[in-house]
Amino acid sequence: MEPLRKPLVPVKGIPLIKYFAETMEQLQNFTAWPDDVLISTYPKSGTNWMSEIMDMIYQGGKLDKCGRAPVYARIPFLEFSCPGVPPGLETLKETPAPRIIKTHLPLSLLPQSLLDQKIKVIYVARNAKDVVVSYYNFYKMAKLHPDPGTWESFLENFMDGKVSYGSWYQHVKEWWELRRTHPVLYLFYEDMKENPKREIKKILEFLGRSLPEETVDLIVHHTSFKKMKENPMANYTTIPTEVMDHTIYPFMRKGTIGDWKNTFTVAQSEHFDAHYAKLMTGCDFTFRCQI
């Protein structure tokens, strides 16, 4: 098998993993169904966590049903493509309604059908400092990415939007703005960590669903970081090692808030904060880098 690490390929100015970029043309013909629900995040912002929560909601908290397949098969990854693994579009064709779909795509690359149908979107945003540290470690173990280089160079690339999926700043802002015209529930990773039950109840209300209190408690318990890290149907250990090497870093590494402090130097943190302030000026939402 040829090495998977390839340079990122720009599509409409957005750098993407080569294999994902190659699906973009086909992706534009994707047809959304009215009862589809989209989970959208920038990478390393709680996508897998939200996927597991959503599947447990749809399955009424029944653990046997949630264990029917790995999470990436239960919640198809729209733009995913990789040698030796079924692509997201193929998985979606075999997924019965109502479908839950996940994506990291910015709005400029999203299939128009998803916007035209005005399907419900659950967006999860996470503070940029924890995202960039998690992303750096993910680049190391997920071999579809190019080599991340040094932490210092990766940090600069992240700030400049020269990583897969482009600018974090643009991503979190444009999906926030979409709330004004489309049904978007915008959640924060930090709020989910602080009080998962409260956030799950927000999701249920948004979806127009109800579950008994004990089922909600069960979902909170089984979607905790500890339980998911132990669950092979949720922790991505079933992905081929050639694609994700868990001996370098586990896919589910820490899942904490404020871990950035163990990687950023004081100078890097100050440099990042100044850059962040410029790019996030005028935003009517804020992030917490610790709780």
Swiss-Prot record:
InterPro entries hit by this protein: P-loop_NTPase (IPR027417), Sulfotransferase_dom (IPR000863)
Residues annotated as binding substrate: 102-104
GO molecular function: 3'-phosphoadenosine 5'-phosphosulfate binding; aryl sulfotransferase activity; nucleotide binding; sulfotransferase activity
Subcellular location(s) of the protein: Cytoplasm
Record keywords: Cytoplasm, Lipid metabolism, Phosphoprotein, Steroid metabolism, Transferase
Phosphoserine PTM sites in chain numbering: 134
Function, in words: Sulfotransferase that utilizes 3'-phospho-5'-adenylyl sulfate (PAPS) as sulfonate donor to catalyze the sulfate conjugation of a wide variety of acceptor molecules bearing a hydroxyl or an amine group. Sulfonation increases the water solubility of most compounds, and therefore their renal excretion, but it can also result in bioactivation to form active metabolites. Displays broad substrate specificity for small phenolic compounds. Plays an important role in the sulfonation of endogenous molecules such as steroid hormones.
Complex and partners: Homodimer.
Pfam families: Sulfotransfer_1
Protein name as annotated: Sulfotransferase 1A1
Similarity remark: Belongs to the sulfotransferase 1 family.
Location of the active site: 104 (proton acceptor)
Reactions it catalyzes: a phenol + 3'-phosphoadenylyl sulfate = an aryl sulfate + adenosine 3',5'-bisphosphate + H(+); 17beta-estradiol + 3'-phosphoadenylyl sulfate = 17beta-estradiol 3-sulfate + adenosine 3',5'-bisphosphate + H(+); 4-ethylphenol + 3'-phosphoadenylyl sulfate = 4-ethylphenyl sulfate + adenosine 3',5'-bisphosphate + H(+); 4-nitrophenol + 3'-phosphoadenylyl sulfate = 4-nitrophenyl sulfate + adenosine 3',5'-bisphosphate
Primary subcellular site in the record, as a coarse category: cytoplasm
One Gene Ontology biological process: sulfation
Tissues where this protein is expressed: Expressed in brain, colon, liver, and small intestine of mice colonized with B.ovatus and L.plantarum.
GO CC terms of this entry: cytosol
List of residues binding 3'-phosphoadenylyl sulfate: 44-49, 126, 134, 189, 223-228, 251-255
